[in-house]
Amino acid sequence: MKYAVIGNPIDHSLSPVMHNANFAALNDLSSYEAINIRNEDFHRIKEIINDKALSGFNVTIPHKERIIPYLDEIDEQSKTVGAVNTVKIVDGKWIGYNTDGIGYVTGLRQVYPDLEDAYILILGAGGASKGLANELKKFVRPKLTVANRSMDRFESWQLEVNKISLQEAEAALSEFDIIINTTPAGMNQNKEVIINLDNLDSHTLVSDIVYVPFKTPILEIAEAKGNPIHNGLDMFVYQGAESYRIWTGELPQIQIMKDTVLKYL
């Protein structure tokens, strides 16, 4: 079987080394590659994928929403989030899934197993935030709180959450057990910290969905204050593991996937 990840740009993606390491560990002859598809070429997506004879593929930035009109079906998570990151091809039928939420929450539960009574603040109200919130609601009793710079961003939200501004979040920071950054702040060379952590309680876990850099500025500040931190590596690995399960019905070698990615960070 052949699989791939599509995006633009895609050269930086660690998905091929992660998935190919898993295939090798399972003595599976399948392969996984990265395919760069420019926005202006996306109308040829069916032709490009069919020419590669893929059995499934992952979708990353900026195509997670753009792919939806080309799919025959999408799962409930994808409908809620409005984005797809995994496609399974069965007898020519394209079925879309979103594994970001389950990937993140599975990783979070490794470091914070007692989620049930946690008060959680999510920073950002984009697609990633929606996916995480939708999955977290299955495990957490207190209503989730989502903070964003612009309140207009909440207009597309169907989920029942507390919606507050970043200023309100800063004032109430000490009330939360877990704070999750889902914004691009801190990615690559971006040194922005989206929220002031002065009011952070010492017990609060600070998490970021980014894994490059390994410690974003918000995580560095939290760690310097003595708080536990959690980056996006687990989310990346577990969403990939869930993609593999969707494609094959089998369980992957998760530790090998994680160890392989760590070698490149």
UniProtKB/Swiss-Prot annotation:
Among Pfam families, the record links this protein to:
SDH_C, Shikimate_DH, Shikimate_dh_N
Gene3D superfamilies, per the entry: Leucine Dehydrogenase, chain A, domain 1, NAD(P)-binding Rossmann-like Domain
Q: Which reaction does it catalyse?
A: shikimate + NADP(+) = 3-dehydroshikimate + NADPH + H(+)
Q: Which residues form a coiled coil?
A: none
Annotated residues that bind shikimate are located at S13, L14, S15, T60, N85, D100, Y211
Binding positions (NADP(+)): E76, G124, A125, G126, G127, A128, I209, G232
At the top level, the lineage of the source is Bacteria
Catalytic residues at: K64 (proton acceptor)
Give GO MF terms, alphabetically.
NADP binding; shikimate 3-dehydrogenase (NADP+) activity
Entry-linked CDD domains: NAD_bind_Shikimate_DH (cd01065)
GO CC, one annotated term: cytosol
Q: Identify the pathway.
A: Metabolic intermediate biosynthesis; chorismate biosynthesis; chorismate from D-erythrose 4-phosphate and phosphoenolpyruvate: step 4/7
Q: What is its EC number?
A: 1.1.1.25
Going by the UniProt record, its keywords in alphabetical order are: Amino-acid biosynthesis, Aromatic amino acid biosynthesis, NADP, Oxidoreductase
The record ties this protein, via NCBIfam families, to:
aroE
Family annotation (HAMAP family): Shikimate_DH_AroE (MF_00222)
The entry describes its oligomerization and partners as: Homodimer.
Family stated for the protein in its record: Belongs to the shikimate dehydrogenase family.
Name used for this protein in its record: Shikimate dehydrogenase (NADP(+))
Gene for this chain: aroE
